[in-house]
Amino acid sequence: MTIGREKMKVEEILENARKAFKLTTKHFGNTVTFERALFLGWYCNLKQPCKFCYMATQKNKIKDPRKARRRLESVLAEAILMKRIGWKLEFISGGYGYTPKEINDIAEMVAYVQKCRQYLNVGVIDLDNINLDVIEGVVGAVETVSKDRDWICPGKPLDKIKDNLLKAKELGLKTGITIILGLGEKEEDIEKLLNLIEELDLNRITFYSLNPQKGTIYENKPSVTTIEYMNWVSSVRLNFPKIKIITGVWVDKIPMISPLIMSGSNVITKFPLFSVFGTKEAHWIEKEILATGRELLGTFTDIDILAGKKVLEKTPYIEEEINISSENIKRVEELRENINERIESYVSKVLRKIKAS
């Protein structure tokens, strides 16, 4: 492509971003929020894990998969802290290898401590054995729509993911997918994604920029550029004005945040919470969001809110009546002391990090 045509393409993307930003304001108002996936563990039981994934590099190092699971009090403590600082749970994830009952119990308890329904991203799940009263939606890990998808994600057949999402829709749940940019996708793949969104009637989509992991084939590969990322986000917004768009970037890509919001993103995700909260990077992230003219719900910098010394004034959380089994209520209450200890441990970790920085 000539320099002139490249310039025309960039100008087109920037113009589309401008239109997408206006559409986002029209349908979602002037706010941006933080979200974060709640991971249950570090082991993936897929026989053929994804080529890009950190868990794939750890699989052979983990002799006992159950020891790679997080303790329940740790999961619930993080859920409580996320509500405290106004970060919605993007979804409960990392559940490959869990039984439907285990997923159900965890979802019930997380919903109970947060007083709101949850999204699941735990692979193809048997929804008939899940308490749907605590589930807002189901997310499918599509990851990429490129021609190499079956090779990149051999353990995640697209047809099964689609069937699971369509069943969730029939049951009255919201649905979404995850897409990772930087896996070799082409611009023409955007049309494939738009067709998939329409086919599945999705309520939301999460984009991530590839964070190349050591030990994977992508270790030395470049990730997606800001302009490319903007093109994907604005294309989805212009074609689906009411879809929720979540965009994830790593700490080394903070300058991407403003352009992504200006391209139609509602939500920023992916940042490591406890190692970054209150640091200069966290202040920079908030500044990037506010620079777009958007209002930020939630905080990445207020230590007093994290520590529970004051209450967040503006939160994206809307409390709901949550009904779970008496058995799981009992489990939560029996763990209260341990949960509170984990909360204090997380807060102390943040304070030490800030003091050392």
Curated annotation (Swiss-Prot):
Which is a GO BP term held by this UniProt record? Answer: biotin biosynthetic process
User: Which pairs of Cys residues are joined through disulfide bonds in the record?
Assistant: none
Question: What parts of the sequence cross the membrane?
Answer: none
Q: Which cofactor does it need?
A: [4Fe-4S] cluster
**What GO molecular function annotation could you give as one example from this UniProt entry?**
4 iron, 4 sulfur cluster binding
Q: Where is the Radical SAM core domain?
A: 27-242
Listed A to Z, the keywords are: 4Fe-4S, Iron, Iron-sulfur, Metal-binding, S-adenosyl-L-methionine
Family annotation (InterPro entries): Aldolase_TIM (IPR013785), Biotin_synth/BioAB (IPR002684), Elp3/MiaA/NifB-like_rSAM (IPR006638), rSAM (IPR007197)
Binding sites annotated in the UniProt record for [4Fe-4S] cluster: 44, 50, 53
Q: Which domain of life is it from?
A: Archaea
Instruction: Please give the PANTHER family that the UniProt record associates with this protein.
Output: BIOTIN SYNTHASE, BIOTIN SYNTHASE, MITOCHONDRIAL
Entry protein name: Uncharacterized protein MJ0597
